[in-house]
C-alpha cells in the first residue's frame, strides 16, 4: 500500500480542531466551508459545498471528494501540496439556512471526511509514484458500450482503487474497534455487516467473498491494520 506524506494523526488533529467550531453551532454552509478550508488548504485540499435537498437531513452534512491528476504540477514534487488538487465536497440539505450539527452527526461527518481525504491522498501518492517511475498516468478504461454495473466492476477492480478502498475498510472498522480487534474482525470478513463497512460489503456482493479481488483487498486492509 502507498504511504501518504500526510499521516492519520495529522488528519485527526485537524478534525479535532474543527469539532468545537461547528458542533452545536448554527452555521451557514459558507461558514462551515471556511472552517474546513482553514485546516485543509495546506494539504492541497479545496473545500466546497453542495446542496443536495431532502435526501440529506436539515442539520446533517456528508462528504465526498476526488483527486484531479490533471491539476498536478509534475515539476513540483518536492513540495507536493503546493497545488490544490484534491476536492473535499461537503454535501448538505441547502445553503440558505443555518445548520446545527449535533455530536452524533459530527462523528459520522468526521469519519467521512477523514476517509475521503485519506482515500484521495492515496490516489495523489499513486500519481506521484507513477509519474516518477513511468512518466505518465493510467486510469481505468471504460468501453462506451459497458453498462453502469460493468463500469462499476472495472472501477472497483482497478489496483489503485483496491489500495484506496482497503484503507477505507480499515478506517471503517477502527470506528468501533481497536487495531487488534479490527484485525481479528477482518479475519472473519464474511461476518462483517453493511453498517460496519459498506464498501467491503459492496466488494463481496460484486465479486464474491472468495474472489481474487476480495482476497487482494483484504490482504491490503489487514496490512494497513498492522501498522
Task: For each feature predicted by the language model, list its residue ranges.
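Zn2+-dependent metallopeptidase catalytic core
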Residues: 21-46
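Long, well-structured alpha-helical subdomains associated
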Residues: 148-227
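Proteolytic processing junctions in secreted/extracellular precursors
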Residues: 3, 11-12, 20
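Extended non-catalytic scaffold regions that mediate assembly and binding
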Residues: 55-63
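Post-HEXXH active-site segment of zinc metalloproteases
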Residues: 111, 127-156
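Acidic, low-complexity, intrinsically disordered interaction modules
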Residues: 111, 115-116, 128, 173, ...
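Active-site recognition of the HExxH zinc-binding catalytic motif
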Residues: 115-128, 164
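Active-site scaffold of zinc-dependent metalloenzymes
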Residues: 62-111, 124-128
Amino acid at each position: 500500500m502507498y504511504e501518504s506524506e500526510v499521516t492519520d494523526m495529522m488528519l485527526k488533529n485537524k478534525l479535532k480542531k474543527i469539532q468545537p467550531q461547528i458542533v452545536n453551532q448554527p452555521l451557514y454552509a459558507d461558514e462551515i466551508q471556511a472552517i474546513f478550508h482553514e485546516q485543509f488548504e495546506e494539504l492541497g485540499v479545496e473545500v466546497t459545498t453542495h446542496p443536495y435537498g431532502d435526501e440529506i437531513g436539515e442539520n446533517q452534512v456528508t462528504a465526498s471528494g476526488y483527486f484531479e491528476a490533471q491539476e498536478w504540477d509534475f515539476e513540483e514534487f518536492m513540495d507536493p501540496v503546493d497545488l490544490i488538487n484534491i476536492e473535499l465536497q461537503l454535501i448538505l440539505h441547502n445553503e440558505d439556512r443555518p445548520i446545527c450539527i449535533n455530536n452524533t452527526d459530527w462523528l459520522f461527518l468526521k469519519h467521512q471526511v477523514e476517509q475521503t481525504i485519506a482515500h484521495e491522498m492515496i490516489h495523489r501518492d499513486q500519481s506521484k509514484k507513477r509519474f516518477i517511475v513511468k512518466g505518465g498516468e493510467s486510469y481505468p478504461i471504460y468501453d462506451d458500450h459497458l453498462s453502469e454495473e460493468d463500469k462499476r466492476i472495472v472501477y472497483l477492480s482497478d489496483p489503485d482503487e483496491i489500495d484506496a478502498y482497503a484503507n477505507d475498510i480499515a478506517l471503517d472498522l477502527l470506528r468501533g474497534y481497536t487495531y487488534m480487534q479490527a484485525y481479528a474482525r477482518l479475519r472473519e470478513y464474511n461476518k462483517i455487516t453493511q453498517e460496519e463497512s459498506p464498501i467491503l460489503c459492496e466488494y463481496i456482493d460484486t465479486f464474491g467473498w472468495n474472489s481474487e479481488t476480495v482476497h487482494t483487498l483484504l490482504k491490503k486492509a489487514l496490512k494497513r491494520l498492522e501498522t
